[in-house]
Design a protein with these regions (language model features):
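Amphipathic alpha-helical
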Residues: 1, 142-190
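A residue-level signal for beta-strand positions that form part of recognition/binding surfaces
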Residues: 3, 20, 66-68, 107, ...
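Phosphate-interacting basic helix/loop segments used at nucleotide- and nucleic-acid interfaces
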Residues: 7-23, 140-162, 195
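Covalent nucleotidyltransferase
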Residues: 13-135
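Classical nucleotidyltransferase
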Residues: 24, 30-34, 38-71, 178-230
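Short, structured patches in soluble enzyme cores that scaffold and shape functional sites
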Residues: 73-75, 110-115, 141-144, 170-172, ...
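Extracellular/periplasmic catalytic domains that process cell-envelope and extracellular macromolecules
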Residues: 102-103, 160, 206
C-alpha cells in the first residue's frame, strides 16, 4: 500500500522563502493514488467506479508503467455537494447508471508524482508534459510565490473562488508521510481521522450508534458523536 504525502499546517515551521515555494488551491475531494493497477484511497482501498478515468490513462500507463500519480477525485462544479462525489466513488459494485454518473461528475485532479528522488518542480513539469489532456482529468495549476504575504493573498483568491483553502508545496522530494514539504492554509481547524469502531447508544438511543471511535494519523483515538463532523 502506498501512503501519500500528507500536509502539515502552515506556520508550524518556518519556510525558507529564498527557495521555490508553489501554491495551489486545496480541493475538498477524495484523495486518490493512481497506478497501472488501479485507483486507491489513502487506506489502500480500491475505487471501483472510476472506469472512465482508467480508460483515459491506458496509454499513459502503457508508456510509464512505474508512474504513481497523486491527486483527488473532485469536480469544482460540485464543490457544495461533496457527498455526491463520495457516494459515486465509494460504490463497490457500480451499476451502468452509477458509471454514467461518475463519468459526468467525477474528475481526477492530479497534483503530484510519487517520486522520492526528484524535487517538486521536476515532478510537476513531468506531469504537465506527460499526463494526458482529457475531460476526466487535469493537472492542478501551481503559482510560484516569494513570500508569506504573497501566499496569503493567493489563499484569499482561492477562498473567493470556492476552494477549501490553499496548499503550499516546497521544492523538495516527495515523502511517504506527513511532511513539512507540503503545508496547508485553511480558515478553520480540523484533523483527519478514520472510523475504527463505535459505541452503542444509551437511553433513548439504545439500539443505535451512540458515537464513532476515530483514530487520527498519530494513532490517537477519540469519540465523535453522530452529526459532529465525522
Amino acid at each position: 500500500m502506498i501512503k501519500p504525502m500528507l500536509a502539515q499546517k502552515v506556520n508550524t515551521k518556518p519556510i525558507d522563502w529564498t527557495n521555490k515555494v508553489f501554491v495551489q488551491p486545496k480541493l475538498d475531494g477524495v484523495r486518490c493514488i493512481f497506478t497501472k493497477d488501479g485507483a486507491y484511497s489513502r487506506a489502500g482501498n480500491e475505487f471501483k467506479n472510476v472506469a472512465h478515468i482508467k480508460e483515459d490513462l491506458i496509454d499513459f500507463f502503457r508508456k510509464y508503467p512505474d508512474a504513481i500519480l497523486d491527486g483527488e477525485l473532485y469536480n469544482h462544479a460540485l464543490k457544495d455537494n461533496f457527498e455526491k462525489i463520495i457516494s459515486l466513488v465509494k460504490k463497490q459494485k457500480p451499476t451502468d447508471q452509477d458509471a454514467r454518473e461518475a463519468s459526468n461528475d467525477v474528475q481526477y485532479h492530479v497534483y503530484d508524482l510519487v517520486n522520492e528522488d526528484q524535487d517538486y518542480e521536476s515532478r510537476y513539469n513531468w506531469l504537465l508534459r506527460y499526463v494526458p489532456i482529457a475531460s476526466s482529468m487535469t493537472v492542478i495549476k501551481n503559482t510560484l510565490v516569494e513570500s508569506y504575504d504573497e501566499a496569503q493573498m493567493l489563499h484569499k483568491v482561492h477562498l473567493a473562488q470556492g476552494y477549501e483553502g490553499s496548499i503550499l508545496r516546497l521544492n523538495k522530494p516527495y515523502e511517504l508521510k506527513r511532511s513539512y514539504n507540503l503545508q496547508k492554509f485553511k480558515d478553520f481547524s480540523d484533523t483527519e481521522a478514520f472510523i475504527v469502531g463505535y459505541e452503542a447508544g444509551k437511553g433513548k438511543f439504545e439500539g443505535l450508534i451512540g458515537k464513532f471511535i476515530m483514530c487520527d494519523d498519530d494513532g490517537n483515538e477519540f469519540g465523535c458523536p453522530i452529526g459532529k463532523g465525522y
